[in-house]
């Protein structure tokens, strides 16, 4: 039975930085810098605890962020100096100005439940993007039934994975052991088909590429991650 405290994915902010401590942020940021280049104002959708915002702000970008979790928002505010950070949903957020670039890293769009929701979030984001602006959406594309176990600085994480082809859903039950306490929560990732993503993107006045591995390699349905890079035509 899922621990009531942690059945909601967005309540695990206390563990987020612990288990992302050794994530290759340098590689991610090199990729992002290459994609957004000379853009000045960046919006981070699903900013989490604010690591990307912190790096972008420190190299001179004007940044804003939003997250559905109030806990994440409060943690993110401690990592930035001037950034505005909002508690909001990517499906219907409203911000009073447009951005030159929009990023959404670490599988945020996988938390949507359908292609209709993906398109709704995409349309909303394009409405907030300047002409000739760039949007980067980082998607988890793993269809796995293999369990995962890892240890970070003595803290343990055991993840049970189940993929449902019928619903295009990756279901993960995650157990965190911090010291002597174990916490459990469950979340579902909607896994997108490359062809369907292309069909949606073709409806809009955009140029796009589906990449993988944080380099300029074309993604396919076997790629572990898909990075959707979109340019809003001017």
Q: Where is each model-derived feature located?
A:
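Class I SAM-dependent methyltransferase SAM/SAH-binding core
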Residues: 50-92
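A short acidic, Gly/Pro-enriched loop at the edge of an enzyme's catalytic core
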Residues: 94-101
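A short glycine-rich, Lys/Arg-flanked "PGG" loop and its adjoining helix->strand segment in the class I
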Residues: 119-131
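A short beta-strand submotif of the Rossmann-like class I SAM-dependent methyltransferase core
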Residues: 104-106
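C-terminal lobe and adjacent flexible extensions of AdoMet/dcAdoMet transferase-like proteins
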Residues: 196, 200-234
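SAM-dependent methyltransferase
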Residues: 136-200
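Conserved class I S-adenosyl-L-methionine
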Residues: 1-48
């Amino acid at each position: 039975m899922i621990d009531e405290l942690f059945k909601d994915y967005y309540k695990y902010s206390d563990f987020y930085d612990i288990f992302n401590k050794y994530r290759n942020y340098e590689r991610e940021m090199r990729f992002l810098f290459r994609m957004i280049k000379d853009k000045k104002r960046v919006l981070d959708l699903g900013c989490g605890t604010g690591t990307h915002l912190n790096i972008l702000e420190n190299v001179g970008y004007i940044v804003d962020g939003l997250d559905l979790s109030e806990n994440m928002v409060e943690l993110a505010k401690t990592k930035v100096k001037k950034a505005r950070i909002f508690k909001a949903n990517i499906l219907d957020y409203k911000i009073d100005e447009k951005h030159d670039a929009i990023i959404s890293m670490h599988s945020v769009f996988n938390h949507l439940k359908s292609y209709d929701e993906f398109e709704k979030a995409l349309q909303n984001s394009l409405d907030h993007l300047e002409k000739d602006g760039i949007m980067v959406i980082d998607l988890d594309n793993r269809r796995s039934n293999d369990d995962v176990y890892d240890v970070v600085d003595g803290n343990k994480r055991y993840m049970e994975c189940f993929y449902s082809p019928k619903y295009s859903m990756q279901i993960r039950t995650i157990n965190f052991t911090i010291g002597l306490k174990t916490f459990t929560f469950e979340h579902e990732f909607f896994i997108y088909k490359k062809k369907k993503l292309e069909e949606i993107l073709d409806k809009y006045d955009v140029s796009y590429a589906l990449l993988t591995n944080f380099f300029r390699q074309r993604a396919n349905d076997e790629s572990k991650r898909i990075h959707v890079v979109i340019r809003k035509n001017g």
